[in-house]
Amino acid sequence: PLETKLGRKRKVNQSTCNKDFSCVDGFCPSFVTVQGAKIKKRKVTPASDLPMNIFNKLPNPKEINIEKPFDIVVTGIGGTGVVTIGALIGMASHIENKGVSVLDQVGVAQKGGAVLSHIRIASSPKDIHSVKVGKTSADLILGCDMVVVASSPVRELMNINTTQSIINDHETPVAGFVLDPDHSFGGKRIRQIIEKSSKETNFIN
C-alpha cells in the first residue's frame, strides 16, 4: 500500500521480490512485463576511493562492567537481517572478551514471518545460566518490525520499569492487505501498545 494525495495506491517492493519469476504468471500486482529493459544501477563510490582517515577520528567505545547479564531482544520478520544482527552483536561481545549467548527463534519464517534473536551479554560466560531472555527481563528491544514487537510473545519479555525500546516505525504490509485493499495497519495503536510496555521508546525510520 502507498498512501498518496489521490488515495491509497499499490506499489511493488522489488527489493523483496522472489527471483523465480512467478510474477509473470499473474501472481504479482504489477501485471506488467518489460522486455529488453535493464534496471538502472545507482552510482556508488568504490571502497578504495573512500578517505580511510575518517575512521581514525572515531573514538573507541567505552568498555563497561556488567554486574549482571544484559538482555537484548532483536525482533523483526524473516529476510531482514535479524539473525545477522544477533551474530554481529555476539561476535562484538566475544571480541571484548565478554560472555555472550545468542538464541535465534525463526520458527517457519522465511520471508515475512516473525523472527526473534535473544542475546545475553555478561562479564563472564559463567554468569549466563540460560540462553533465552526471561519474561519481563529484556533490557533492550531492537524492533525491526512494529507488528512483531507489539505481539504477545515479545511484550511478555518487556518490563515497563527497565526496558528501553528502539523501534523501526516503517509500516511493513501485513497479510490483511492481501484480502482487503482498505485494511487499516493501525500504526498509532501499535505505537501505543509498545510505549505502554516500555520504560522508554524511540521510534526511528
Where do the PLM segments sit?
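Terminal amphipathic helices with adjacent charged low-complexity linkers/tails
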Residues: 2-50
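Active-site cofactor/cluster-binding pocket
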Residues: 33-74, 80-205
